């Protein structure tokens, strides 16, 4: 079997569909999505609220079941994997950034970035060294021992970015990553996020409703009413 690192296509999605029951009615959220993202590519998933962006990220992030279609990550067909194998893919190959940071409140900035590495099996020394590197790269060298409540919103989100990149994921999924920040702070966080993603060679899918943000990515696909309707 090929190593995951040998696959140029980080993720291949074919005919992905998702529907929910609402009383006697079935609400179709995703309607047959096809998408390929290559190693190192940064993709904007553009669409208004309710278009299905978050549902799509939950599906390809292996955070929810109930989908039909095919999701292939680094050559592994997700539908054929058991829960333990899916968890291993999330841990080893995926990183997540959300609109709200979801940092652990009782852990310092440094500890929040060390934790996913320790779970993956890194030694405390390795985890600390890499966490230092990421946080320093994000201009947080003076905030390593600060707890989330002691950080500004922009600083919290930069720690969340460092945590998402801590295990050098093949694919980072970001859902409106600057949506909770003012425009100036959001621009700074996005710039630093994209710089680090490119430096690591990760691919990324960034969901946004903001065309100005989307134009900073390598490629834009537009999601409307559960369908990919255009690409540029």
Swiss-Prot record:
Gene Ontology CC terms, in alphabetical order: plasma membrane
One GO molecular-function entry: ATP hydrolysis activity
Location of this chain's protein in the cell: Cell inner membrane
Keyword Nucleotide-binding: yes
Domain of life where this protein originates: Bacteria
Disulfides per UniProt: none
CDD domains tied to this protein: ABC_MJ0796_LolCDE_FtsE (cd03255)
Listed InterPro entries: AAA+_ATPase, ABC_transporter-like_ATP-bd, ABC_transporter-like_CS, ABC_transpr_LolD-like, MacB-like_ATP-bd, P-loop_NTPase
Lipid metabolism is among the record's keywords: no
Sequence similarity: Belongs to the ABC transporter superfamily. Lipoprotein translocase (TC 3.A.1.125) family.
Official protein name in the record: Lipoprotein-releasing system ATP-binding protein LolD
Organism from which the protein derives: Zymomonas mobilis subsp. mobilis (strain ATCC 31821 / ZM4 / CP4)
